[in-house]
Design a protein with these regions (language model features):
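Asp-box/WD-like beta-propeller blade repeats and closely related beta-sheet repeat scaffolds
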Residues: 120, 128-160, 164-170
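Short beta-strand elements that form the blades of beta-propeller/WD-repeat-like
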Residues: 57-67, 111-117, 124, 159-173, ...
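Structural signature of eukaryotic scaffold interfaces centered on beta-propeller domains
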Residues: 51-56, 103-109, 150-161, 205
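Structural motif
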Residues: 70-75, 121-127, 171-180
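Beta-strand-rich domains and repeat architectures in extracellular enzymes and scaffolds
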Residues: 40-73
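C-terminal motif of bacterial Sec signal peptides marking the signal peptidase cleavage site
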Residues: 14-15
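A short helix->beta-strand "capping" segment at the edge of beta-propeller domains
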Residues: 24-50
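Blade-loop segments of beta-propeller domains
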Residues: 83-118, 140-148
Length: 205
Protein backbone atom coordinates (compact mmCIF):
# COMPACT_ATOMS: atom_id res chain seq x y z
CA UNK A 1 0.00 0.00 0.00
CA UNK A 2 2.87 2.39 0.89
CA UNK A 3 4.49 1.74 -2.49
CA UNK A 4 1.23 2.49 -4.29
CA UNK A 5 0.80 5.75 -2.37
CA UNK A 6 4.38 6.80 -3.15
CA UNK A 7 3.94 6.14 -6.85
CA UNK A 8 0.66 8.07 -6.86
CA UNK A 9 2.24 11.03 -5.04
CA UNK A 10 5.17 11.14 -7.47
CA UNK A 11 2.79 11.10 -10.43
CA UNK A 12 0.76 13.97 -8.97
CA UNK A 13 3.87 16.05 -8.26
CA UNK A 14 5.13 15.40 -11.77
CA UNK A 15 1.82 16.55 -13.21
CA UNK A 16 1.98 19.77 -11.20
CA UNK A 17 5.44 20.71 -12.48
CA UNK A 18 4.89 19.80 -16.14
CA UNK A 19 3.91 22.55 -18.59
CA UNK A 20 0.92 21.86 -20.80
CA UNK A 21 1.40 22.55 -24.50
CA UNK A 22 -2.22 21.83 -25.39
CA UNK A 23 -3.86 24.74 -27.19
CA UNK A 24 -7.10 25.95 -25.64
CA UNK A 25 -9.89 27.55 -27.58
CA UNK A 26 -13.58 28.18 -27.07
CA UNK A 27 -15.79 25.72 -28.94
CA UNK A 28 -19.26 26.15 -27.41
CA UNK A 29 -21.14 28.65 -25.31
CA UNK A 30 -23.90 27.99 -22.82
CA UNK A 31 -25.25 31.55 -22.78
CA UNK A 32 -28.74 31.73 -24.27
CA UNK A 33 -30.37 35.10 -24.93
CA UNK A 34 -34.03 35.35 -25.92
CA UNK A 35 -34.32 38.06 -28.57
CA UNK A 36 -37.94 37.41 -29.55
CA UNK A 37 -39.16 40.67 -27.98
CA UNK A 38 -36.45 42.64 -29.78
CA UNK A 39 -37.40 41.54 -33.30
CA UNK A 40 -38.99 44.31 -35.38
CA UNK A 41 -40.94 43.35 -38.48
CA UNK A 42 -41.19 45.84 -41.33
CA UNK A 43 -42.83 45.80 -44.73
CA UNK A 44 -40.61 45.63 -47.82
CA UNK A 45 -43.41 46.59 -50.20
CA UNK A 46 -42.79 45.40 -53.74
CA UNK A 47 -39.19 44.46 -52.95
CA UNK A 48 -38.86 40.68 -52.98
CA UNK A 49 -36.06 39.35 -50.77
CA UNK A 50 -34.83 35.78 -51.10
CA UNK A 51 -33.95 33.30 -48.39
CA UNK A 52 -30.18 33.71 -48.83
CA UNK A 53 -29.72 37.29 -47.66
CA UNK A 54 -27.41 39.23 -45.37
CA UNK A 55 -27.94 42.50 -43.52
CA UNK A 56 -25.47 45.36 -43.31
CA UNK A 57 -25.77 48.63 -41.42
CA UNK A 58 -24.39 52.07 -42.18
CA UNK A 59 -24.86 55.29 -40.24
CA UNK A 60 -28.10 56.04 -42.08
CA UNK A 61 -29.11 52.93 -44.00
CA UNK A 62 -30.00 49.29 -43.66
CA UNK A 63 -28.69 47.29 -46.61
CA UNK A 64 -29.96 43.83 -47.54
CA UNK A 65 -27.78 41.77 -49.88
CA UNK A 66 -29.92 39.18 -51.68
CA UNK A 67 -27.50 36.56 -52.99
CA UNK A 68 -30.17 34.69 -54.98
CA UNK A 69 -31.64 37.67 -56.79
CA UNK A 70 -31.55 37.68 -60.59
CA UNK A 71 -32.29 41.42 -60.75
CA UNK A 72 -31.16 44.05 -58.23
CA UNK A 73 -29.10 42.35 -55.54
CA UNK A 74 -28.78 45.08 -52.90
CA UNK A 75 -31.82 46.77 -51.34
CA UNK A 76 -31.40 49.93 -49.27
CA UNK A 77 -33.78 51.08 -46.53
CA UNK A 78 -33.82 53.99 -44.11
CA UNK A 79 -32.35 52.70 -40.85
CA UNK A 80 -34.67 54.74 -38.63
CA UNK A 81 -38.12 54.11 -40.11
CA UNK A 82 -37.32 51.20 -42.51
CA UNK A 83 -38.73 53.06 -45.50
CA UNK A 84 -37.52 51.80 -48.87
CA UNK A 85 -34.94 54.00 -50.61
CA UNK A 86 -33.54 52.19 -53.66
CA UNK A 87 -32.02 48.98 -55.03
CA UNK A 88 -28.65 48.59 -56.75
CA UNK A 89 -26.25 45.90 -57.94
CA UNK A 90 -27.61 44.51 -61.20
CA UNK A 91 -27.12 40.76 -61.58
CA UNK A 92 -25.29 39.66 -64.72
CA UNK A 93 -21.99 39.33 -66.52
CA UNK A 94 -21.83 42.83 -68.00
CA UNK A 95 -19.08 45.35 -67.15
CA UNK A 96 -21.03 47.06 -64.35
CA UNK A 97 -23.00 43.99 -63.23
CA UNK A 98 -22.38 41.62 -60.32
CA UNK A 99 -22.08 37.95 -61.24
CA UNK A 100 -21.30 36.25 -57.91
CA UNK A 101 -21.81 38.70 -55.08
CA UNK A 102 -19.63 38.36 -52.01
CA UNK A 103 -19.56 40.57 -48.95
CA UNK A 104 -20.36 44.27 -48.65
CA UNK A 105 -18.20 46.84 -46.87
CA UNK A 106 -18.95 50.47 -46.08
CA UNK A 107 -16.60 53.46 -46.12
CA UNK A 108 -18.55 55.85 -43.92
CA UNK A 109 -16.05 58.71 -44.29
CA UNK A 110 -16.40 58.88 -48.07
CA UNK A 111 -19.97 57.50 -48.42
CA UNK A 112 -18.79 54.54 -50.48
CA UNK A 113 -20.18 51.00 -50.64
CA UNK A 114 -17.81 48.23 -51.72
CA UNK A 115 -19.22 45.04 -53.25
CA UNK A 116 -17.13 41.95 -53.97
CA UNK A 117 -17.69 39.96 -57.16
CA UNK A 118 -16.01 36.57 -56.82
CA UNK A 119 -16.65 35.59 -60.43
CA UNK A 120 -14.80 38.61 -61.79
CA UNK A 121 -12.43 38.78 -58.79
CA UNK A 122 -13.11 42.49 -58.47
CA UNK A 123 -14.48 44.85 -55.85
CA UNK A 124 -16.91 47.47 -57.14
CA UNK A 125 -17.42 50.87 -55.55
CA UNK A 126 -20.81 52.60 -55.32
CA UNK A 127 -21.18 56.23 -54.29
CA UNK A 128 -24.02 56.14 -51.76
CA UNK A 129 -25.11 59.72 -52.44
CA UNK A 130 -25.25 59.15 -56.21
CA UNK A 131 -27.24 55.90 -56.11
CA UNK A 132 -30.01 57.68 -54.20
CA UNK A 133 -30.65 60.18 -56.99
CA UNK A 134 -29.45 58.46 -60.18
CA UNK A 135 -31.30 55.30 -61.21
CA UNK A 136 -28.79 54.77 -64.05
CA UNK A 137 -25.72 55.05 -61.82
CA UNK A 138 -22.86 52.72 -62.76
CA UNK A 139 -20.29 51.54 -60.21
CA UNK A 140 -16.54 51.85 -60.55
CA UNK A 141 -13.93 49.13 -60.05
CA UNK A 142 -12.26 49.81 -56.69
CA UNK A 143 -9.63 47.07 -56.92
CA UNK A 144 -8.93 43.62 -58.33
CA UNK A 145 -8.58 40.56 -56.10
CA UNK A 146 -5.75 38.04 -56.24
CA UNK A 147 -6.98 34.59 -57.24
CA UNK A 148 -4.36 32.81 -55.10
CA UNK A 149 -5.19 34.70 -51.88
CA UNK A 150 -8.26 36.89 -51.55
CA UNK A 151 -10.69 38.22 -48.91
CA UNK A 152 -14.02 36.45 -48.57
CA UNK A 153 -15.20 38.86 -45.85
CA UNK A 154 -13.63 41.94 -44.37
CA UNK A 155 -14.19 44.85 -42.01
CA UNK A 156 -13.16 48.02 -43.80
CA UNK A 157 -11.26 50.57 -41.71
CA UNK A 158 -9.56 52.59 -44.43
CA UNK A 159 -7.94 52.02 -47.83
CA UNK A 160 -4.74 50.76 -46.22
CA UNK A 161 -6.26 48.60 -43.48
CA UNK A 162 -9.05 46.05 -43.44
CA UNK A 163 -9.38 43.03 -41.15
CA UNK A 164 -10.24 40.18 -43.48
CA UNK A 165 -11.02 36.48 -43.66
CA UNK A 166 -8.52 35.38 -46.31
CA UNK A 167 -9.04 32.41 -48.60
CA UNK A 168 -6.15 30.47 -50.14
CA UNK A 169 -7.35 27.77 -52.59
CA UNK A 170 -5.42 24.50 -52.29
CA UNK A 171 -7.28 22.63 -55.05
CA UNK A 172 -10.45 22.95 -57.10
CA UNK A 173 -12.53 21.90 -54.09
CA UNK A 174 -10.53 22.80 -50.95
CA UNK A 175 -8.95 25.87 -49.41
CA UNK A 176 -7.24 27.17 -46.30
CA UNK A 177 -8.73 30.05 -44.37
CA UNK A 178 -6.90 32.73 -42.38
CA UNK A 179 -7.63 35.90 -40.48
CA UNK A 180 -5.35 38.74 -41.51
CA UNK A 181 -4.73 42.35 -42.46
CA UNK A 182 -5.39 43.59 -45.99
CA UNK A 183 -4.16 46.76 -47.67
CA UNK A 184 -6.73 47.53 -50.36
CA UNK A 185 -4.44 50.07 -52.05
CA UNK A 186 -1.41 47.82 -52.50
CA UNK A 187 -3.12 44.42 -52.35
CA UNK A 188 -0.78 43.29 -49.56
CA UNK A 189 -2.26 40.62 -47.27
CA UNK A 190 -0.65 39.55 -44.01
CA UNK A 191 -2.25 36.42 -42.47
CA UNK A 192 -2.11 35.90 -38.72
CA UNK A 193 0.40 33.25 -37.69
CA UNK A 194 -2.18 31.29 -35.69
CA UNK A 195 -4.97 29.40 -37.44
CA UNK A 196 -7.89 27.73 -35.68
CA UNK A 197 -7.75 23.92 -36.08
CA UNK A 198 -11.42 23.77 -37.12
CA UNK A 199 -11.02 25.97 -40.21
CA UNK A 200 -8.46 23.90 -42.07
CA UNK A 201 -9.24 22.30 -45.43
CA UNK A 202 -12.86 23.33 -45.72
CA UNK A 203 -14.59 22.00 -48.82
CA UNK A 204 -16.23 24.35 -51.29
CA UNK A 205 -19.78 23.23 -52.11
Amino acid sequence: MRNILCVTLIALLGGCTSTSVTEKYQDKRNDIINVKDKVIEFETGNVLIGSVSRLYMSNKCLLIADHKSVDKQIHIFNKNDFSYLTSIGNFGEGPEEITVMGCLAIDEAHHQLYVSDHAKQKIFSYDMDSVMVDSLYKPQVKTAMNETLFPSEYQYINDTLSIAVLIKPTSTSTFNQFLGRWNMNTGEMIPMKYTHPDIQKKRIT
